[in-house]
């Protein structure tokens, strides 16, 4: 496997892994967004979920204020935003910015690496899963396959987790409610299923993930299976022993892949190989 390539594209930090096997012609591309939990940078996510079994370019994009965009080399700025306003200073702007940055970053990376964007897959973990779901729901970028790991399916559930950590209720208002509605992908399942070609989707959910996120995962899979012409194109893999993170703390720098992450990696890779073509 070639060495990781790092840099920025359209202002977005990236880690790119070249195809690990010879491919004839331009190879497909898998674009992945990391967690805010560990692994919490593009480089760390590439190490935790390298997807080496997929004959494609694997592009890991950095979330706002993470990795090369961290403030003062740490995550304090992210924590401050979550404390200040979990919905309007953290969840909504992070997901929205990452989704808005994607097309320009993808175009620049395609010019540099020459991958085939007509065969694109999206992958996301936790809050990065909400970015991937936003891409699917907005339907502007063609996507051939998708995989989500412990995704943030409903923003209200993420806010609920922050409420628990801060031990205080979130002060919901109309603006926050509207933002949360846009990041409720069970409610938006009709938009995801309305793509001209319905995207095969694998949702990996840890048995030890937060209960609210496990419930949301079940609800999204059920909603999409109801709407898909081929319900088997939507699958839920519930993984024993998997909590929310995919890596150990601090999760900023690349680290050896954990055995549980290898299990997730194999599950996602098998799905992408089957559907990316």
Task: Locate the predicted segments by residue.
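Short, flexible, mixed-charge acidic loops at enzyme active sites
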Residues: 69-84, 161-165
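Short, surface-exposed "cap/lid" segments of acyl-processing enzymes
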Residues: 10-73
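C-terminal catalytic histidine-bearing segment of alpha/beta-hydrolase fold enzymes
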Residues: 227-277
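Acidic beta-to-alpha connecting loop that harbors the catalytic carboxylate
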Residues: 36, 207-210, 242-243
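The feature captures the conserved acid-bearing segment of alpha/beta-hydrolase catalytic domains
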Residues: 156-229
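Conserved alpha/beta-hydrolase "nucleophile elbow" surrounding the catalytic nucleophile
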Residues: 34, 124-126, 206
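Alpha/beta-hydrolase active-site loop
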Residues: 79-113
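Primarily recognizes the serine-hydrolase "nucleophile elbow" in alpha/beta-hydrolase
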Residues: 104-166
């Amino acid at each position: 496997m070639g060495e990781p390539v790092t840099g920025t594209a359209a202002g977005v930090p990236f880690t790119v892994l070249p195809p690990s096997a010879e491919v004839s012609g331009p190879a497909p591309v898998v674009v992945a967004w990391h967690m805010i939990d560990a692994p919490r940078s593009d480089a760390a996510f590439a190490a935790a979920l390298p997807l080496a079994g997929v004959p494609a370019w694997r592009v890991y994009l950095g979330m706002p204020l993470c990795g090369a965009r961290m403030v003062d080399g740490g995550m304090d700025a992210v924590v401050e935003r979550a404390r200040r306003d979990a919905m309007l200073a953290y969840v909504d702007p992070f997901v929205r910015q990452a989704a808005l940055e994607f097309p320009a970053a993808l175009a620049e990376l395609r010019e540099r690496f020459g991958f085939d964007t007509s065969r694109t897959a999206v992958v996301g973990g936790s809050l990065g899963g909400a970015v991937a779901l936003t891409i699917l729901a907005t339907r502007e970028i063609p996507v051939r396959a998708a995989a989500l790991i412990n995704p943030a399916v409903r923003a209200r559930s993420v806010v609920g987790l922050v409420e628990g950590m801060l031990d205080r209720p979130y002060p919901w208002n109309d603006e926050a409610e509207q933002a949360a509605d846009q990041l409720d992908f069970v409610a938006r399942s009709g938009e995801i299923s309305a793509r001209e070609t319905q995207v095969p989707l694998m949702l990996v959910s840890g048995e030890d993930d937060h209960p609210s996120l496990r419930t949301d995962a079940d609800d999204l899979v059920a909603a999409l299976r109801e709407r898909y012409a081929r319900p088997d194109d939507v699958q839920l893999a519930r993984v024993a022993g998997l909590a929310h993170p995919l890596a150990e703390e601090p999760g900023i720098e690349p680290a050896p892949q954990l055995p549980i992450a290898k299990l997730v990696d194999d599950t996602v890779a098998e799905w992408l190989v089957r559907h990316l073509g």
